[in-house]
Amino acid sequence: MAPRPRPGQLMLDEIREQPLVLERLWREEGAAVRALARRLRARRPPAVVLAARGTSDNAALYGRYLIETRLGIPVSLAAPSVVTLYGARVRWRGMVAIGLSQSGRSPDIVRFIEATRDAGALTVAITNSPRAPLARAADEVLVLHAGRERSVAATKTYTAQLTMLSLLVAHTAEDRRLIRAHEALPDAVASALETVPAVTDAAAHLSQASECLVTSRGYNFATALEAALKLKESSRMVAEALSSADLLHGPIAVVERDFPVIVVAPRGRALGHLSGVLRRLLRRRARTVVLSSVPRLLASAAVPVRLPDVQEEALSPHVYIVPLQLLAYHTARLRGLDPDRPQGLRKVTYVL
């Protein structure tokens, strides 16, 4: 009988596995992604709807930003209850509906994809389980090839979902620069794994706090949401994610001396705004953890987490989430918790 893993070992192993997962996805599913991209270009859908829950819902939000900015197609994030609770018949004909679920067994997502397919949408499943109900419900299936994810906290399937979405959009847009930029992702994610000394410093501060804020903007708003979710799941911390734009519309009032705020600030269109938000947080004496490659931002942080420059801003979420996954792990361990077995959680949640 194999020995029981140490607390959190499954989560840590799966975080470390991510560079190999992204390489395998590119290799195994590239042809399927290109074929679906051709079908999407031919279809020219007037809109896309993305259906997901939990971590997958954060990946879906990233997909919304990417599809709207790179393809110019309006995107809706699904409210599955419209179908499963209210039985509404929505006019989906001609549109594209994408369901994201690592297990492929979330009943409300499966039912939503079935309803959109029956209403005339082209349906796509993005899942780690090619034989799951979601895959059977969809017209097209993209498989994550992430291997079994044993920890309750999803890590490697999240970055795989981000990569699947960015590859699909890059090929649909026939954006050669964005396509080529994916080749550097495994190495960039491997570099992000080397942030452990800074991350453990941040965890030492967070483990003593009862709450924190996580903020970013644009593509990395999804990163902030996923980081907050991981801290809640693994560390039992009241972590709230806010767009840095929304943070200024009132919530910044809760920030006082030594209040922990995590700022995700890669180079890109949102950097100027995030720099201004960081200055305001510093004036309020917040204890800031800053993830960036920009020296002047890192120099102002209580805990700087230096990351490599990412060639394409649109791919920075794939890299910037990695130290935040590590942060959730280390914070949980410092609190004496097992992030592989969060209290009251299961790997698959059944909601209809």
Please provide the spans of the model-predicted regions:
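Generic C-terminus detector
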Residues: 4, 311-352
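Active-site phosphate/pyrophosphate-binding segments
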Residues: 6-10, 14-45, 49, 140-260, ...
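Glycine-rich phosphate-binding loops that contact phosphosugars or nucleotide phosphates
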Residues: 41-187, 217, 252, 264-310, ...
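Hydrophobic membrane-spanning alpha-helices of multi-pass integral membrane proteins
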Residues: 259-267, 320-321
